[in-house]
Design a protein with these regions (language model features):
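Single conserved hydrophobic/aromatic residue that forms the stacking wall/gate
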Residues: 1-12
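Short N-terminal targeting/anchoring amphipathic segment
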Residues: 26, 37-64, 82-84
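Membrane-proximal helix-turn-helix segments that form the acceptor-binding/catalytic region
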Residues: 65-80, 89, 93-111
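Donor nucleotide-sugar binding/catalytic pocket of nucleotide-sugar-dependent glycosyltransferases
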Residues: 106-123, 127-144
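A short helix/loop element that forms part of the nucleotide-sugar donor recognition site in Leloir-type
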Residues: 143-158
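Conserved donor-binding/catalytic core segment of Leloir-type glycosyltransferases
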Residues: 158-175
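A structural motif in glycosyltransferase catalytic domains
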Residues: 165, 177-183, 193
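Glycosyltransferase donor-sugar binding loop
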Residues: 192-203
Length: 203
């Protein structure tokens, strides 16, 4: 798994996934450090977010060559590569990040898509690629769902009468924070509450 620092929620999900795979008896590692430094032989390397492999804000053109070399090194030892395509490109990708995406997309033995649009768009650019669609899961039945809205608000210490706006995703920069805060402030609702646990860096 190529994820390293996508936030506590993502770390938790990654850990749950790795633990579940381990319980089946499969040895699994979740580490970009091992990708760059290990000489071990792996059956499969699964990329999730190419920008996490090279560093989210990386602007070192040399990393592109090193990424190609590492993939070639592992492939020479029989490793297969899987890439789960979460998005086309990050919103603020520079040229180095774009090249990392190109390399991982073109070098992966299988590309997993979370929907048809991604598959069709990708096959248009990579007609000889091997692809699979695994629909993005929904969180239904993941949590206790027999709790009332009133009881949930009481448990979370949220005002019963407030109109609650949630933003659980990661905020990558100040522009995204300003956009959410601006939209929230301009919302014509007297009793409103913004619930955005990852609004500020390191939160």
């Amino acid at each position: 798994d190529s994820s390293t620092s996508r936030g506590l929620g993502d770390v938790y999900k990654r850990q749950v996934l790795c633990d579940a795979i381990r319980m089946t008896g499969v040895d699994v590692r979740c580490s970009t450090k091992e990708f760059w430094e290990s000489d071990k032989t792996y059956d499969i390397i699964h990329f999730q977010w190419p920008e996490e492999v090279v560093g989210r804000m990386c602007d070192d053109p040399g990393i592109v060559r090193r990424l190609e070399e590492r993939i070639a090194f592992f492939r020479s030892r029989g490793t297969h590569f899987v890439y789960t395509r979460h998005n086309v490109r990050p919103h603020y990708a520079n040229e180095v990040i774009g090249r990392a995406y190109d390399i991982i997309e073109s070098q992966s033995d299988v590309v997993v898509h979370m929907g048809r649009f991604s598959l069709e768009e990708f096959v248009g650019k990579h007609p000889d690629s091997r692809n699979a669609v695994i629909l993005h899961h929904i969180y239904q039945y993941t949590y206790q769902e027999d709790i009332s809205v009133e009881r949930a608000r009481q448990y979370l210490q949220l005002p019963q009468e407030a109109f609650i706006v949630t933003a659980f995703g990661e905020f990558r920069n100040c522009e995204e924070i300003r956009m959410v805060l601006g939209a929230f402030r301009s919302w014509n609702e007297k009793q409103k509450l913004l619930l955005a646990p990852r609004l500020y860096p390191f939160s």
